[in-house]
UniProtKB/Swiss-Prot annotation:
Family: Belongs to the complex I subunit 4 family.
GO MF term (any one): NADH dehydrogenase (ubiquinone) activity
Subcellular location: Mitochondrion membrane
Keywords associated with the record: Electron transport, Membrane, Mitochondrion, NAD, Respiratory chain, Translocase, Transmembrane, Transmembrane helix, Transport, Ubiquinone
Catalytic activity, EC: 7.1.1.2
Main subcellular localisation: mitochondrion
Record's function text: Core subunit of the mitochondrial membrane respiratory chain NADH dehydrogenase (Complex I) that is believed to belong to the minimal assembly required for catalysis. Complex I functions in the transfer of electrons from NADH to the respiratory chain. The immediate electron acceptor for the enzyme is believed to be ubiquinone.
Protein name: NADH-ubiquinone oxidoreductase chain 4
């Protein structure tokens, strides 16, 4: 069934990527932005899984794992840290966090890099392999699906730049609010380490998947 409906899934996945990306570009709510970006990334590993190639399936699983690390960290940043301190989720009310929360800004930056699929993160490995699998099956839709890389970089850079930089800190924050607590720091650091560690050395994940994925492809063919 996955072979018979592959191209339908491809079309649905590409439409989802484009629609979610444009929706993300227009939102000003930080949690909505992260949620819409999650939909776009989910569509990427959907079409990677339906590419019925070893690279595509391995990449989709790796991207799903990476997405779990990065999105969890970003939601903690948005809801567990920023919202708790300001009681607002609107990006337009944030600016200058680097001045009063430098440690948070660094951890948030690394997670933002992961969300945009920057090299040396597990997200890059997953996206590259997923899209490579799509290119092998249908190059035209592979090109359209690759626009997710451009869009994710655009809305992630906008979000980070608007929140962390942008002049003096917002009136919604006080200068003495303090940086991240020890609990918040440990939670974010775990996600950052996993994202970067497996981005630099993804072999434990990919080698562990290779036999099962190869067996699956062999049975399908």
């Amino acid at each position: 069934a996955s072979i018979n409906y592959t191209y339908i899934i491809y079309v649905i996945g590409v439409i989802t990527i484009l629609y979610a990306s444009f929706s993300t570009l227009r939102t000003i709510d930080i949690k909505e932005l992260i949620a819409y970006s999650s939909v776009s990334h989910a569509a990427v590993y959907l079409i990677g899984a339906f590419s019925n190639t070893i690279q595509g399936i391995e990449g989709s699983i790796a991207l799903g794992l990476a997405h779990g690390f990065v999105s969890s960290g970003l939601f903690i940043c948005a809801g567990g840290i920023l919202y708790d301190r300001s009681s607002t989720r609107l990006i337009t009310y944030y600016r200058g966090m680097a001045q009063i929360m430098p440690i948070f800004s660094v951890l948030f930056f690394i997670l933002a890099l992961g969300n945009s699929g920057t090299p040396l993160t597990l997200n890059f490995i997953g996206e590259f392999m997923s899209l490579y699998g799509v290119f092998e099956r249908m190059p035209i839709l592979g090109v359209l699906a690759s626009t997710s890389i451009v869009f994710s970089a655009a809305y992630t850079i906008f979000m980070y730049n608007r929140i962390v930089f942008g002049g003096s800190y917002s009136i919604y924050f006080r200068e003495n609010i303090g940086d991240v607590t020890r609990r918040e720091f440990i939670m974010l650091l775990v996600f950052v380490i996993l994202t970067v560690l497996f981005g630099i050395y993804p072999a434990p994940i990919l080698d562990g998947l290779h036999y099962s994925v190869s067996y699956l492809i062999y049975n399908i063919n």
